């Protein structure tokens, strides 16, 4: 069955280990598509095993745009993503390709569909200032500081979410205005119809896959990958890249804070918690086509409907 382009953008969403990438590749085998990654971990170079990044042969045959675009120490925001993804969508339509945005980072999808507020950009000086504050005070105390400045933002942000806490404080420091006030006006980034597909296997199946995949990662050199990252003096535990599930626990193990068995258990639990958060977000999405298992035929029928 041929597929209709019709200037439509496809969101292929799902929790971790749901099979999104495999389904996207199957669609690329049959149709002229442009795969655009929507994953805040896959952007980083040198983080391949722990992020379940498609291997180099697969990426060469079926390119995924917005993978390997940053070093782990680099800053990359939802604004950066929205701008880059929008450029890829425009390129897709110019080449008569169907843009398929595939991933599980809800904030990135939300930014594209609903837009972002215009916030002051980080500077190296402000970034360093708040990194030092994070090291000296910790997330809980910084979260209390944020409560005094912007209660609305503090109520939305988890007390352990170091990245979002420091960003909210940084925004106030740079602009003199609270994050909540600046987030008032938003405009959608995408000005095209969006069709949303959610791949949602049973929870028990996802939990089993998560455990099996992490154990497989361990067998395929995940700890060596993290050891290599630790050789970079610019990397530390509070960076977004190192806070990715699996990497944080491996980092703690290599620093002697936990033993290997505890590291494996904590990494699997953290990934299952991520899966739960993703499922909560996905259940709130409206006007979606839900699949329990990958079916290219059903997806094409939905896209053409």
UniProtKB/Swiss-Prot annotation:
Keywords: ATP-binding, Magnesium, Nucleotide-binding, Transferase, tRNA processing. One of its GO terms (molecular function) is tRNA dimethylallyltransferase activity. Its EC number is 2.5.1.75. InterPro entries: Dimethylallyltransferase, IPT, P-loop_NTPase. It holds the Pfam family IPPT. It is an enzyme of class 2 (transferase). GO terms for biological process: tRNA modification. The keyword Membrane does not apply. Transmembrane segments: none annotated. It catalyses: adenosine(37) in tRNA + dimethylallyl diphosphate = N(6)-dimethylallyladenosine(37) in tRNA + diphosphate. Monomer. Belongs to the IPP transferase family. NCBIfam families: miaA. This is tRNA dimethylallyltransferase.
